[in-house]
Every structure is written in C-alpha cells, then in structure tokens.
Amino acid sequence: NHINAVRTCHYPDQIPWYYLCDKEGIYMIAETNLETHGSWGKAATLDDTWNVPGSVPEWEAMTLDRAKTQFEVLKNHTAILIWSLGNESFVGETLCKMDQYYRNQDPDRLVHYEGVFWQPEYKSRMSDIESRMYAYPKDIREYLEKEADKPFILCEYMHDMGNSMGGLNTYMNLIDEYDMYQ
C-alpha cells in the first residue's frame, strides 16, 4: 500500500505510537498541539489583529510552551523526520517564532506548517515544505510544474465526507508522476 509516513494530526498521539513507528521504520510528522481553526478573522475578513495566535504577542508564550513541551517529550524518537507547528492556525509572527525554536533545538530535522499557504509572504521564513489541505489535483500539478522550490505534501485530504474517497486514484497518480510530491 506504499504507506511509509504519518502525520500526528492535530496534536501529539499516545507515546506507544511513537515507539511503534521507531521500531517499524515509519516516518513521522510530529504535530504540535495547536489548532485555532475558526478564529482567523471577523466578519468574514482576514485580519492580522484578529488571528489567533497570528502576530498577537499575548499568544507567544503559550504557543512556544506547546512547542517546547512536544520537543522535550519526543526529541529522542528516531521516527520523527519533521516537526509540525500545528494545524489550521493561520500564520503570523508567533508561528515564525515556533519555527525558529524547532530549528534552533533540532537543526537536522525539517519543519512543516500548512497554514503558511494563506500568507505567502511568510514562505521564506517558515516551513521547509509546501503543504496544503484538500487541494485540487490541478492545483498540486500547477505548483509542481511552476513553483516547486520546496517539496509538496498534501498533509490532509480525502476527508471521509461528501464523495467519501472518490477520486483517490488522481492523487495517487500525481505521487507516481512527481518526485517532489508526497
């Protein structure tokens, strides 16, 4: 079935899972316990002063504490290839500081964050990977053919709603076609 990697979405998992992945050679994206889905804007507009954690200084200590806790608990697990800053928490200076924390503590592992997609001006400052959720295959192909300066991971897709796994073969065909896509 060609599965060799997992993402611990949307927060760290039970410790036995990490030991199992270490033992069986399964690569992991270890995701920080941070999700602020639904608090990105007000009145249907994106507003940097409203985003949580965004660039709001009051959220910096809390988000860094979550990154530090995850790092200290999981740093010795060999299965972890990538640290993830969290899930659907928009983007901003606070997340840039989390990215920098992981890089300072563990320069040999990659950093992942999907939310940078929403504000491309942060792409040069965080995440080693271009990552999106529920992107259409045509958008993935467009990135891989025109912009591919970072590997692309579709970190969440085929949600079991609506078409319920319909079209999976289209995503799998792209994986076979492009080396920079997982």
Where do the model's predicted regions map?
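Substrate-binding/catalytic cleft of secreted carbohydrate-active enzymes
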Residues: 5-182
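Phosphate-binding active sites in nucleotide-utilizing proteins
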Residues: 2
